[in-house]
Amino acid sequence: MFTMKKSLLFLFFLGTINLSLCEEERNAEEEKRDGDDEMDVEVQKRFIGPVLKMATSILPTAICKGFKKC
């Protein structure tokens, strides 16, 4: 009976270690994904500024030529 309790306790201990390692790995993967999202937002911010500047310089000329009132 004592050996069975000892082996069950050992299996429980191994199971809890395994679960904690899986949880740490999952948290690391989530942090990795969150970092990619932040990087994408930063790239989008860098991209939107120059595009808006270009659009504001080209749009009035295009409208003027489109309506032929230049």
From Swiss-Prot:
Prosegment location in residue numbers: 23-44
InterPro entries: Frog_antimicrobial_propeptide (IPR004275)
Tissue distribution of the protein: Expressed by the skin glands.
Signal recorded as keyword: yes
Classification via Pfam families: FSAP_sig_propep
Subcellular compartments: Secreted
Protein name as annotated: Gaegurin-LK1
Gene source species: Limnonectes kuhlii (Kuhl's Creek frog)
